[in-house]
Amino acid sequence: MPTSADRTARPTLMKTAIRIFELSLGEMLWSRRSVFLALLGAAPVALAGLIRFAAFAGPAALPQVNGERLDGSVLFGLMIWLLYLRFIVPVLGMFYGTSLIADEVDDKTITYLFVRPIPRGAVLVGKYLAYFVCTALLILPSVVLVYFLVVPIGGGSLGGTFPAFLTDLGMLAAGIASYGALFAWVGARLKRPLVIGLVFVFGWEPGVLLFPGYLKRATIAYYLQGLVPHAMPQDSAVSVLLQAFQEMPPVALSLAALGGVTLIGVYLAARATESREYVLEQ
């Protein structure tokens, strides 16, 4: 027979986080925000279809760099960097990350979560895990379709580029995790988190990366770009240009920095959720 102490014991953080994850994942997948962001993820697929059609109509339509016509694998690498890592992943991380707690406050449902005898930080951790899975499910079909549409252009081999494709998926996962963790902390700690996220994604990161110096190290994109040349063919003109005109951090440093941003961001977000008093506006 369970004792009264057993019945009143607080659930552990991990058990609570898993339960919150199960409840939140379905809500995120079927939310209006996910429908809009799924359409955003469909944009690269439409672009890839246009590129494939142009290549079928005439190879001369494909872009060139220094007189060298770009093949499908290089075009795919550029799309991963310019469309996914520099735009779609930060936007998804910003919209989902800042809303993990803010949506509960705006909907005045946060009280129902916090009056229960569960660790507050577990609510944030569970919602963050749901964000990661939801975002991965939104992006993965888009990336796979773009891969099959673009890579065969110019005689590219799907089998030969598959290891690089796995590296691209790893970069996307690192970006989803790190941006989400950063914006989860912003959403849990600060007011007007979406405004701050917009300034960071569309103002701070693009602006700082254009100038030499140490400020670019205070961006996530700087460490993500350190992984990009290693996912692209090393003998391609685009890879040479990336290495020549941009300062690339070592791969080990990039992985350590992205992992640190993820772990510290989730920890600080959970701590902020535990300590902050949320005032519901009437």
For each predicted feature, which ranges?
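Aromatic- and glycine-rich beta-strand/loop motifs that create alpha-glucan
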Residues: 2-38
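Terminal transmembrane helical anchor/hairpin motif
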Residues: 3, 51-76, 189, 194-275
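Membrane-interacting alpha-helical segments
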Residues: 14-29, 163, 167, 221, ...
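Helix-loop-helix units of permease transmembrane domains in multi-pass membrane transporters
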Residues: 21, 96-132
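Alpha-helical transmembrane segments and their helix-start/interface "positive-inside/aromatic belt" motifs
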Residues: 25-41, 131, 192-198
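Secretory targeting signals
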Residues: 42-99, 124-189, 194, 209, ...
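Hydrophobic/aromatic residues in alpha-helical transmembrane segments
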Residues: 93-97, 110, 145, 179-182, ...
